[in-house]
């Protein structure tokens, strides 16, 4: 984000982030230790954070948006200051900062997270399986307009079903959300936490927090998309 407190010469850095607790806990303390900076971390979904940055455009509070949807960043180009990391030259070409204001920091795949205590004999191996009537009202997803992980799933399923311009692909999206039955989680974290807690059978999520739940012994498994 443009010109927050640290940019004005203070010793604090304000970071807005939709990233998982695991990633933030692994990076923020080490960053503070290495650079002697005190971080004020504000966590919310990508859409909520971008809206906040929009409202603060004339008096920015945040210094950095750490994580989120590239599409939302591209469509709000006026919110960001130009920045290209000195390490960009070491990044493989496909992931270099070519726009001048987005620095990629992680490759994190889309996954389905499945509650192994609830799934029974229902097959879940891909997007088509989510149309099973037995899963109606038992599928967790966030709003693609506000969640970067939900938006990633939307683009993935459209491509998997025929492409962005394909009527059958959009019909799949319609049918899926009919099966979701109006149960839209407020954030990405609500998806994987809801599945792990047994509120949902399956959720459309992303690798990092779901893998951590598996490592922590939660009754879940991951299906990579």
What are these regions (language model features)?
Residues 17-38, 214:
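Short, polar/charged alpha-helical segment
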Residues 1-13:
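Short, low-complexity disordered leader/linker segments with a strong preference
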Residues 14-25, 44-48, 54, 61-199:
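Extracytoplasmic ligand-binding site segments that recognize negatively charged/polar headgroups
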Residues 186, 216-225:
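Extracytoplasmic/periplasmic substrate-recognition and gating elements
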Residues 144, 188, 205-209, 225:
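Histidine- and/or cysteine-centered catalytic micro-motif in compact active-site loops
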Residues 71-76, 196-220:
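A ligand-binding cleft/hinge motif common to bilobed small-molecule-binding domains
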Residues 12, 38-40:
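Residues at or immediately flanking beta-strands
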């Amino acid at each position: 984000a443009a010109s927050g407190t640290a940019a004005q010469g203070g010793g604090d850095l304000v970071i807005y982030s939709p990233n998982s607790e695991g990633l933030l806990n692994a990076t923020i303390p080490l960053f503070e230790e290495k650079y002697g900076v005190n971080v004020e971390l504000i966590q919310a979904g990508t859409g909520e954070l971008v809206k906040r940055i929009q409202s603060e455009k004339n008096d920015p509070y945040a210094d950095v948006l750490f994580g989120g949807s590239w599409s939302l960043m591209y469509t709000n180009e006026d919110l960001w200051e130009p920045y290209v990391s000195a390490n960009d030259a070491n990044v493989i070409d496909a992931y270099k900062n070519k726009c001048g204001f987005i620095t990629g920091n992680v490759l994190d795949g889309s996954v389905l997270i499945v509650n192994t205590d609830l799934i029974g004999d229902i097959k879940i191996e891909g997007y088509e399986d989510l149309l099973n009537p037995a899963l109606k009202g038992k599928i967790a997803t966030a709003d693609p307009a506000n969640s970067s992980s939900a938006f990633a799933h939307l683009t993935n399923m459209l491509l998997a079903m025929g492409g962005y311009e394909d009527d059958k692909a959009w019909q799949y999206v319609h049918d899926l959300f009919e099966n979701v039955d109006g149960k839209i989680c407020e954030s990405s974290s609500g998806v994987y936490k809801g599945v792990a807690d047994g509120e949902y059978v399956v959720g459309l999520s992303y690798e990092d927090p779901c893998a951590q739940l598996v490592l922590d012994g939660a009754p879940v498994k991951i299906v990579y998309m």
